[in-house]
């Protein structure tokens, strides 16, 4: 997997400081970075950084991402954490605890494909 552009744009120290500040100020929220997968034909997302409620499910977060990229109903979207599809019913807090980066952020990648094969 290619290195996150967020990681390339910000030093580890800066990312750690920001994640720590966020977690101290909003202990019931999770700092998430969402980026489009390389070579995906799905639209770009308007913002990459999200402060997600800990009790939100992965499925609910997918809905948020879908709305942000204004994805048409016939298109599927897939969210990956470390190149793996997390269970839709899993809580974001559980995914965060298992997969957070050394900088304190949870990195998610999204990709899509046309589920109906329209020509």
From Swiss-Prot:
CC terms in the record's Gene Ontology section: autophagosome membrane; cytoplasmic vesicle; microtubule
Membrane topology, as annotated: Lipid-anchor
InterPro entries: Atg8-like, Ubiquitin-like_domsf
Cellular compartment(s): Cytoplasmic vesicle, Autophagosome membrane; Vacuole membrane; Cytoplasm, Cytoskeleton
CDD domains: Ubl_ATG8
Positions annotated as propeptide: 118-119
Coiled coil: none
Superkingdom of origin: Eukaryota
Function description: Ubiquitin-like modifier involved in autophagosomes formation. May mediate the delivery of the autophagosomes to the vacuole via the microtubule cytoskeleton.
Family of this protein: Belongs to the ATG8 family.
Protein name: Autophagy-related protein 8B
Gene that specifies this protein: ATG8B
